[in-house]
Regions:
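Flexible, surface-exposed loop/linker segments and immediately adjacent secondary-structure boundaries
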Residues: 8, 12-18, 23-59, 66, ...
Length: 226
C-alpha cells in the first residue's frame, strides 16, 4: 500500500507541489487568510447571487457552481474547495460564520477541518462524521465517494444506518464508496481519484497548518523521490 501511494504521488505535478511549498511558506509567515471566499472561477453563486472574493459564507447559505467553475472559501479554522457543477448547503446555527458541516447535494468537495472540531458532511447516500480531517467527497444520487485523506471519519450509510465504518488514515489509505438503494453492499473499497496532495497543502496553508503527510516531501528540490 505504501508503494501504491508513492506511485500516486509521482503522478502529482512536481511543479504544482513546488508552487504549494512556496504558497505554504507565505501563508505560514503571514498567518491565516481572511475568512470568506478566497478564490473563485466561473459561475459561482451564494443564495443565487454571484459570489465575489471576500464574501462571507454563513450557515444556511447555498453555494452553487456552474460548469468549469470552482470556489475556495475559509470558515473558522476550516478551508473548503467546491468543484464544478455542485450544490452545497452550509450547515450550523442560522447566520453563523463557523459551520457545523456541509450538505453536499451534488458535486465534489475537498476540505480540511481543524483538529478537535467535529463536523458532519452529508450527501444523498452518506453521513460522514469528521474530526480534524482532510477529506474529499463526490456526491451523486446513486453513490458517494469519500477519501479520508488523513484523520478520522465515521462513514454511515443513509439507506442502512447499520452499515458503518470508522476510517483512520494518514495518507489516502482507505477511500470508500457509500452506495445508494438497491446496492448489494453499502460500503465498498474505492481508488484514489480526482484530488491531489498539492491541493491539500494549499488548503491547510490557508489556515496556517501543514498536512501530516508534509514530511513525504522532504525538500522542494527533491519532489520525485517517491
Amino acid at each position: 500500500m505504501r508503494n501504491n501511494r508513492r506511485r500516486w504521488i509521482v503522478g502529482v505535478s512536481a511543479g504544482a507541489i513546488a508552487a504549494q511549498f512556496a504558497f505554504l511558506r507565505g501563508a505560514l509567515a503571514a498567518g491565516s487568510v481572511e475568512k470568506g471566499v478566497y478564490r473563485l472561477r466561473g459561475d459561482v453563486r451564494i443564495n443565487g447571487t454571484p459570489a465575489k472574493e471576500g464574501m462571507d459564507v454563513r450557515a444556511g447559505d447555498v453555494i452553487t457552481t456552474g460548469p468549469q467553475s470552482e470556489v475556495l472559501f475559509v470558515t473558522g479554522r476550516d478551508a473548503v474547495l467546491i468543484r464544478a457543477n455542485a450544490r452545497v448547503e452550509a450547515q450550523g446555527a442560522a447566520g453563523a460564520l463557523v459551520l457545523s458541516g456541509l450538505r453536499i447535494v451534488t458535486g465534489a468537495v475537498l476540505s480540511v477541518f481543524s483538529p478537535g472540531s467535529p463536523r458532519t458532511l452529508s450527501t444523498p447516500t452518506a453521513t460522514i462524521g469528521i474530526r480534524g480531517t482532510g477529506i474529499y467527497v463526490e456526491a451523486e444520487e446513486a453513490r458517494t465517494y469519500a477519501c479520508v485523506c488523513y484523520g478520522v471519519a465515521d462513514l454511515v450509510s443513509v439507506m442502512d444506518p447499520s452499515a458503518r465504518e470508522t476510517v483512520r488514515t494518514s495518507h489516502h489509505e482507505q477511500p470508500r464508496y457509500i452506495m445508494g438503494a438497491g446496492a448489494p453492499q453499502m460500503l465498498m473499497g474505492a481508488p484514489v481519484i480526482n484530488h491531489t496532495d498539492a491541493e491539500l497543502i494549499m488548503l491547510e496553508g490557508l489556515v496556517g497548518r501543514r498536512p501530516p503527510f508534509f514530511s513525504y516531501y522532504p525538500t522542494e528540490r527533491n519532489l520525485s523521490g517517491y
